[in-house]
């Protein structure tokens, strides 16, 4: 996720000279340098002694956070805001490891950020200034839309809907393509039809002011082919809505478990 956002930032004008990446794994560091032409260091200690960033972005897998986050406590003590895109790590977690006065913005982005079509939900603690909030929002807006939630516990549901959501959409493409194959379409044709249909419908929904339900009704003729399919997909007991309810509930519960 961090790599996707970094590529999105750079492609949308964030200056390479203003970026420092800490990557302890040599192969990954080399790949980033060669691909993105940015400064990649193997440890925070390699930064210039007088270097103080405007924002520290934590894009680390949850299991690696305990070893990494405390190293940035000095920056937090200097008032630098920490922006986390790590799943399952709460604002209080950062307060424990960075200091009680640390300015922290917890976010949940998603992978379409890599192509500038992401959406990020963000939640800030009381130590984040208005200027810092604006700076973080500007950074996040470079890769898509931003919504702020005032209650941190909402991040679990956000994770289930939009953080994990791209995987659901990709699965929909897979399922549509396989169903098309089952009806006799060549695999490559079915895949192209499914991919383009989902991508185009998503863009139509994004640009439209109408609710998704209205857009659905606009392409559904009574007694037609779409209506026949929707009778299956909208069945009360085993249709898409109860299935999605269970999926979102499972992801939300798992997000809470990861947060401890």
Task: Give the label of every model feature segment.
Residues 1-45, 55, 118, 181-183:
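NAD(P)+-binding Rossmann beta1-loop-alpha1 motif at the extreme N-terminus of oxidoreductases
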Residues 19, 29, 47, 186-193, ...:
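Small-residue helix-packing motif on alpha-helices
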Residues 75, 93-103, 119-157, 168-207, ...:
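Internal alpha-helical scaffold of NAD(P)-dependent oxidoreductase catalytic cores
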Residues 26, 36, 44-122, 126:
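Rossmann-like NAD(P)(H) cofactor-binding subdomain of soluble oxidoreductases
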Residues 195-260:
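NAD(P)-dependent Rossmann-like dehydrogenase/reductase catalytic/cofactor-binding core
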Residues 105, 154-160, 212-217:
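Short pre-catalytic strand/loop immediately N-terminal to key active-site residues, enriched for Gly-Thr
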